[in-house]
Amino acid sequence: MPADGGKGLLDTNILILRNRIEHGALPAEVAISAVSLAELSAGVHQAHGPEASAERARRLLLLQQVESEFDPLAFDATAARHYGRIAGAVSAAGRSPRRRVADLMIAAVAAAHQLPLYTTNPADFSGLGEFVEVVAVPRPHSEG
């Protein structure tokens, strides 16, 4: 779905891929959740393997760019109440909300601020349509 010039909340994957995402696929005004900052920060410390040092540096640079560009929306009491309803619905549908905590918290922030949620992973938010509008953004052809 193309952007309509409004405002939207970006999922963490959009922050990681956004330099390669088609500009018109995102809203004119974008916001992020503090939960996405937490995911990006954790990613810096979870880089392992033979290229870990270079990967940590790349992830840290992305985190610093995002921190300097955005004033994230907090996961506050209103978002917490939305999270409770969302997690309850996920559980009632027979799925475990525990494996999806960060995604559900991001969805709750979007719901609390009445913002559509832009993601390249819409399946992560399946079944949440009554709580938040999920906008599927095409993945870039080359992610490398």
Features from the language model and the residues they span:
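Flexible glycine-rich beta->alpha loop in the catalytic core of nucleotide-sugar glycosyltransferases
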Residues: A123
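Conserved acidic donor-binding loop of glycosyltransferase catalytic domains
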Residues: T120
